[in-house]
Amino acid sequence: MKVNSKTLQSVKEDLLNIEQTLNKLIKVNNPILSAAAKHLLIVESKKIRPAIVLLVAKAIDKNKKIKTSQQRLAEVTEIIHTATLLHDDVVDESIIRRGTKSVNKTFGNKIAVFAGDFLFAQSSWYLANINNLEVVKAISKVITDLAEGELQQNLTQFNTYYSIIKYLEKSFNKTASLIAASCKSCCLLSDFDQSLNSKFYNYGKNLGLAFQIIDDILDITSSSTALGKMTTSDLKLGNLTAPVLFALTKNSKLFKIIEREFCEKSDISEAINIIKETNAIEESFDLAYEHIEAAINSIKDLPTSSEKDSLIEIAYDLLNRYK
């Protein structure tokens, strides 16, 4: 998830602190496991998920203060996200992540799985030490959602009767749940109006759904270099995303290509051409835009602040990834 660096200006120093802290938090005696666990954490990235948590913390505090527990929540969010990437790359046999070799490509599948498990365990430890039961419940549910989402995806590969509703349910579990719960948990850790919980939960939920839809568009339309990971990987695996599902309603030939599981050499390129020739990409973008609008509307009544503006800008930056 990429955003304009100016959008994160108000939490720039806080993010630098988090990057330094993350390296210290991941403690393990085995050097191979340590290197594998830190492989993606230390790769330069926007760290947008922890940035969102920090922006929420400042947006709801008139003194613009970030509590220690909120910073730790931001760190836990990034650790969980990284753990999911390690496991996803093993399942999807990915070789590139964040513009570098994936952990499974560098260290092998077993080490990648162990490293992902280790990061989940570390996140649970640090989460428990935040010492807030409601936050523990919210983030623990995320880990359940992540597993369920991955299973939903793998059990529906090449299923041409898969619906947009089911796709959004899966996308919530795999992507949006973590952002939604982190935003809500940041409010739970504040000393301010708890009625904001649902507003920020809905912001995170819709932002996460929009991100996944845009990411799925780019999997069809972008390059591996621009995206920082292999493109058309979901399509090849039979993971039917929004552009594919919309295209299926307009071209019966795509049904046949998918149902034979791309067994012919030209099937992938032909499927991509069909998707691009329909207005499936545009329909997918419109769906993402609906969720962006819903995210922004969730927080539009907040008091004016640079942090609120940044949260809104992050939403629009997602759309600019496609444009």
Curated annotation (Swiss-Prot):
UniProt entry tagged with the keyword Chloroplast: yes
Database matches in PROSITE patterns: POLYPRENYL_SYNTHASE_1, POLYPRENYL_SYNTHASE_2
Chain sites annotated for binding Mg(2+) 1: D88, D92
GO cellular component: chloroplast
Enzyme class: transferase
Function: Possible role in synthesis of the nonaprenyl side chain of plastoquinone or in synthesis of other prenyl chains such as undekaprenyl pyrophosphate.
Protein name in the entry: Prenyl transferase
Naturally occurring in which organism (per UniProt): Cyanidium caldarium (Red alga)
Gene name, Swiss-Prot/TrEMBL: preA
